[in-house]
Amino acid sequence: MAKEKISPGMQQYLDIKKNYPDAFLLFRMGDFYELFYDDAVKAAQILEISLTSRNKNADNPIPMAGVPYHSAQAYIDVLVEMGYKVAIAEQMEDPKQAVGVVKREVVQVITPGTVVDSSKPDSANNFLVAIDKVGSRFGLSYMDVSTGEFFATELDDFSSVCSEIQNLKAREVVVGYDLLETDEQVLVNQLNLLLSKETEGYDDVHLIGNSLTDLESSVASKLLQYVHRTQMRELSHLQKAQHYEIKDYLQMSYATKSSLDLLENARTGKKHGSLFWLLDKTKTAMGMRLLRTWIDRPLVNQASIIERQNIIQVFLDNFFERSDLAESLKGVYDIERLASRVSFGKANPKDLIQLGHTLAQVPVIKAILESFNDDALSGLLQELDALPELESLIRSAIDPDAPATITEGGIIRDGFDETLDKYRKVMSEGTSWIADIEAKEREASGITTLKIDYNRKDGYYFHVTNSNLSLVPDHFFRKATLKNSERFGTAELAKIEGEMLEAREKSSTLEYDIFMRVREQVERYIDRLQSLAKAIATVDVLQSLAVTAETNHYVRPVFNDEHRIAIDRGRHAVVEKVMGVQEYIPNTITFDSQTNIQLITGPNMSGKSTYMRQLALSVVMAQMGAYVPADSVDLPVFDAIYTRIGAADDLISGQSTFMVEMMEANQAIKRATPNSLIIFDELGRGTATYDGMALAQSIIEFIHDKVGAKTMFATHYHELTALSNSLTHLVNVHVATLEKDGEVTFLHKIVDGPADKSYGIHVAKIAGLPTDLLNRADTILTQLEGETVVIQPQEKVLSQEKPAIETHVNEQISLFDDFTENPVLQELRDLDIYNMTPMQVMMAVADLKQKL
């Protein structure tokens, strides 16, 4: 059977497609972007568009699907949102002028990490991450292509890399080295990332600079190379790569941020119910993004924290001026995104109008800040560059009523360009000239119904009905004959028409050229615009924090060097807002310099978790520079927060609750310092009772003796409260309850000392379990309470070689009696679990299990 002949157009498609095998290729053909072969089949299913075929009568018709070019962005967004890449192949010449097949080239590859234009613009950052490795060290760089932000750092291990990728909420990672298969599975299956390979670097001294380490420079250059390879243009809005270190900020894992509901509610995935939702009173898109960053990366430098506090205090002291400031910020558009559109060559007249309006607001904002007359604002005032020459250019050049498109005219203001004004005068006067000709010929010919009309085919013409044809003058010439009338022209009308058409054509071309020149001039200001955007964003965030502080009666925290926590009548900021101030029960939190651990007992649903989260949120708010919900707050500056709060466990990845508990506990124990905060909620619940109790006790002892971090440890193992007798830096607190007439009321108040009951059956009653079941549980509880559990201090365990928990129940058979060493044990010892991800640990254990 003869091989089917491929048309030149389809051969061109195949030649381009082979260079982009991992992307949907949108192939411009006239007014449509077409997809062929497998791309068409998959796209038709995903986008719910019609699947047809090319060469339908052939033995093997080619599957085909298409979308209109003017509405393609919405379809592209769907594909990218689902994690696909999309390559855009445009026609590079006018099809009318083309000889043979129209020349086509891919002009951009849009990926999940490089989205700039979108039919649903989102003010949040969209970070593209790159990772590299030399020896045992990892380099990580990230960029938001839509704003130009660019950063790089070094990390110790792959676990830290994964944590940072999660914190950045990245959707795509560029890999610059040979990735281990197990690591790839973690990135793809657990973190749900699109991986792209890039082994070459892009040498740009201006963007990379010399402030980065060699490894940071390597990973940043590979990220740049990928961006240039996909965007296929020079991007003037990209900022110089900035070095950063994780230790420069309050360290929190993604799990910690999620459990504290910092940026979104962990249960709903929505902004509502998060700290971000509570604090966000920003007026600008840049301010909103910066607020997210401040919440995500609180500071550890006390001087920088106080600098933010000072400005918030100025805003609090000047209510009316602050209100004026907030009102003026409403007139500020997203400068960072506008600058990127200019850089991409996609800025339209509306974009420049928005930029002009924004620049006109800067002097107003600056004047309001100057009216505060406070030195705390001097730095911000210096950064508020109004760019008067750019504002003047835009105001004088762009018509305020200009359309969004750049090919329809009506863009440039009258008076900006002399030649353009001349063409416009011809077009304007031409209309009156035609009216004069019409009146003159009507009178001369005696045809009272004579009028001049226009259409694209015939241009301007005299319309004469058949009944008046005998009156047509000799200098009229016929242009068209219709059923009931004829169309005529004259030399004079043709001359005027020619001048008008020439003026219209030249005007349109000139107006486009002028706009492009103006846009090029705007591009020269991108660096200054980005600096201005940062300053306005900072002002916006600080006024937002002032508003929330005033509205919710927050106080300014102070910091101490004595490792002391003193929060008087503190509140959980988000819970208070949701419940209402009148309903919320405040709690005082006190750790003197000698107290490191609070062991918290009390019923489920009584408020233990809220109490612990209250402290963690107070620390986050204080160290981001915000005010805190309490009557007074005195804190040390923490270097990290480690949590194990299991309410939001996600077991889809195959990890058991207990495995997650142990992994998170391991991270805290391994990384925490005396300057860290540890929050452990019901640690050990994921395994058998006595296993869990033994682990809980040993972890408490380890933190007490080896780590020294401020720790809140909530437990349902009431026996552990006896540890206060042997651990000098541990105190017991519990949630108060009120029992009356057989009914139990949780007071949600934390008081000193251990709880005497757990009230689990009461909680089950609240949940609505059957009465017979509850009565039976009460009987069993009475029997179990007759058994004894004695907690022994660590010293006694070491001296008598007995388990820490001594019980009067049946003992388990020892696993270590008559023990003979198994060679697998040495492999187990050699596992470097501190530098392995949970998935890697589980795979290694599974491998060892096969050898037993």
UniProtKB/Swiss-Prot annotation:
Q: List all disulphide bridges recorded for this chain.
A: none
Q: Which GO terms describe its molecular function?
A: ATP binding; ATP-dependent DNA damage sensor activity; damaged DNA binding; mismatched DNA binding
Matching Pfam families, A to Z? Answer: MutS_I (PF01624), MutS_II (PF05188), MutS_III (PF05192), MutS_IV (PF05190), MutS_V (PF00488)
Residue positions binding ATP: 602-609
Q: Does the UniProt entry include the keyword Calcium?
A: no
Question: Which SUPFAM superfamilies has this protein been placed in?
Answer: DNA repair protein MutS, domain I, DNA repair protein MutS, domain II, DNA repair protein MutS, domain III, P-loop containing nucleoside triphosphate hydrolases
InterPro entries documented for this protein = DNA_mismatch_repair_MutS, DNA_mismatch_repair_MutS-lik_N, DNA_mismatch_repair_MutS/MSH, DNA_mismatch_repair_MutS_C, DNA_mismatch_repair_MutS_clamp, DNA_mismatch_repair_MutS_core, DNA_mismatch_repair_MutS_N, DNA_mismatch_repair_MutS_sf
Question: Looking at the record's lineage, which domain of life comes first?
Answer: Bacteria
Q: Which GO terms describe its biological process?
A: mismatch repair
Single GO cellular component term:
cytosol
Tell me the keywords, alphabetical order. Answer: ATP-binding, DNA damage, DNA repair, DNA-binding, Nucleotide-binding
Q: Which family does it belong to?
A: Belongs to the DNA mismatch repair MutS family.
- What does this protein's UniProt record list under function? This protein is involved in the repair of mismatches in DNA. It is possible that it carries out the mismatch recognition step. This protein has a weak ATPase activity.
Q: What is this protein called?
A: DNA mismatch repair protein MutS
Taxonomic source organism: Streptococcus thermophilus (strain CNRZ 1066)
